[in-house]
């Protein structure tokens, strides 16, 4: 059964709500697919394409930051005069930090699109990396600002982001956990997480988009477009609220949410209510 408009709209809403929260949007889309009337995993391609919508929200929200970083990076490399060294370095770190997820994404492409979408793996990753986030939030020193980001840490952020190729890890959850463990403030870790995602998510989304042109799309292009638009609108609202919350609030509600959802998923799998797939 093909996916209907209401289902696609719901998945777009879910993508927008969960992409920037440390709860794994890919896990939520993977799980939700099992309960929809069409009863199917929307697939890695649908997930990647709808993420273009949420990353457009990042571009809009962080436009002035991105332009400032890009200008400093260009002025440094084209020797156009004075530039902000911290912004130029951040530009390089976003580029270098994107390398791990690109390399590993291409190397493990088949596993990412098939075997790693097994819901048992998703459930375990939700629990394990939820606990990691909780520990990071508790023991992290939270003293460094984004303009203090160094090369070593920027690259470690990149490897943490690459872990999110496994549904259940969470791209933002992995990078935020890494940032907290490295001593960065909650807001600094979250902001760099959002900026670091731009090249990787756009790259993955447009790769899947162009790859899918001319092929049979099990979801439907109209439905995919609707989901992407909804993901953009909802994602922007989530960024606004989330960045206000993380400056003063703990990540523990997200930790408990991940752990509970992970165990519920294991129970549903164990009792045969849903199949693991993958």
From Swiss-Prot:
Entry annotated with the keyword Transmembrane helix: yes
InterPro entries linked: UppP
GO terms under cellular component: plasma membrane
Enzyme Commission no: 3.6.1.27
Pfam families: BacA
Superkingdom classification of source: Bacteria
Keywords: Antibiotic resistance, Cell inner membrane, Cell membrane, Cell shape, Cell wall biogenesis/degradation, Hydrolase, Membrane, Peptidoglycan synthesis, Transmembrane, Transmembrane helix
Location(s) in or outside the cell: Cell inner membrane
Keyword Transmembrane helix: yes
One function term, GO molecular function aspect: undecaprenyl-diphosphatase activity
Transmembrane feature ranges: 43-63, 88-108, 119-139, 149-169, 194-214, 226-246, 254-274
Membrane topology: Multi-pass membrane protein
GO BP term, example: cell wall organization
First-level EC class: hydrolase
Major subcellular location class: membrane
Family membership: Belongs to the UppP family.
Known function: Catalyzes the dephosphorylation of undecaprenyl diphosphate (UPP). Confers resistance to bacitracin.
Anything else known: Bacitracin is thought to be involved in the inhibition of peptidoglycan synthesis by sequestering undecaprenyl diphosphate, thereby reducing the pool of lipid carrier available.
The protein's name in its UniProt record: Undecaprenyl-diphosphatase 2
Species this chain originates from: Agrobacterium fabrum (strain C58 / ATCC 33970) (Agrobacterium tumefaciens (strain C58))
């Amino acid at each position: 059964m093909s996916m209907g408009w209401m289902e696609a709209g719901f998945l777009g809403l879910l993508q927008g709500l969960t992409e920037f929260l440390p709860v794994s949007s890919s896990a939520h889309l993977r799980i939700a697919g099992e309960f929809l009337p069409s009863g199917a995993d929307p697939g890695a391609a649908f997930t990647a394409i709808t993420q273009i919508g949420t990353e457009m929200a990042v571009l809009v929200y962080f436009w002035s930051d991105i332009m400032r970083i890009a200008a400093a990076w260009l002025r440094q490399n084209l020797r156009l005069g004075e530039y902000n060294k911290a912004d130029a370095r951040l530009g390089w770190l976003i580029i270098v930090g994107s390398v791990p997820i690109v390399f590993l994404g291409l190397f493990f492409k088949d596993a990412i699109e098939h075997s790693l979408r097994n819901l048992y793996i998703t459930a375990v990753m939700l629990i394990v990396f939820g606990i990691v986030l909780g520990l990071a939030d508790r023991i992290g020193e939270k003293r460094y600002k984004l303009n203090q980001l160094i090369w070593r840490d920027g690259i470690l952020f990149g490897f943490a982001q690459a872990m999110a190729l496994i549904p259940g890890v969470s791209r933002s959850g992995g990078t935020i956990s890494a940032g907290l463990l490295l001593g960065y403030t909650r807001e600094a870790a979250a902001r760099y997480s959002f900026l670091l995602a731009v090249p990787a998510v756009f790259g993955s989304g447009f790769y899947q988009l162009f790859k899918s042109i001319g092929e049979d799309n099990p979801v439907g292009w109209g439905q995919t477009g609707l989901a992407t638009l909804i993901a953009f609108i909802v994602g922007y609202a989530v960024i606004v609220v989330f960045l206000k919350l993380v400056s003063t609030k703990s990540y523990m509600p997200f930790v408990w949410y991940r752990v509970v959802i992970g165990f519920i998923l294991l129970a549903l799998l164990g009792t045969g209510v849903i199949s693991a797939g993958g």
